[in-house]
Amino acid sequence: MNFYRVEQMPGFIKTEMQKIQKAVQPFMKKTVIYRFLAIPLAAFSLFNLAAFLFHASADRESLISAGIFALLAALGLAFFKEAGYQHKQIQKTVHIYMLNRIKKSEILSEERKSSYARQIKEEPFAMRSFVEFLTEEDRRKKMY
């Protein structure tokens, strides 16, 4: 989801996007932190572990170092997996928000609301359908 284009959108869409952004902000913060930790930690550890395995001897001190690098690599990969889980939570939260927003609409008919809800459930990136819904709702609101 690209929140950078929000500033170019009409006010009624901008308001809804800001509400979505506010709902997913805690998940986005966690995702950024986990990825920020995961990538350097895993890359550093895996690189050192690979270099260590090719150039080190098999004494006790070397095995402890290898174990530490393996543990750090596993930690980095776990952070990366958690970042992926947080990203899925973001998508789920956005979908739930959009579906609830469509259900709450008092301007569109039940048929149109169910059509938009179906489109959002079927599309992997449903933002376009949600923007169409908001545009149609605003257009009908101005008519009445």
UniProtKB/Swiss-Prot annotation:
It holds the Pfam family DUF5392. Keywords: Cell membrane, Membrane, Transmembrane, Transmembrane helix. It is found in: Cell membrane. GO terms for cellular component: plasma membrane. It is a multi-pass membrane protein. Signal peptide: none annotated. InterPro entries: Uncharacterised_YwnF_TM. It comes from the Bacteria. The keyword Membrane applies. The chain crosses the membrane at residues 31-53, 63-80. This is Uncharacterized protein YwnF. It comes from Bacillus subtilis (strain 168). The lineage of its organism: Bacteria, Bacillati, Bacillota, Bacilli, Bacillales. The gene is ywnF.
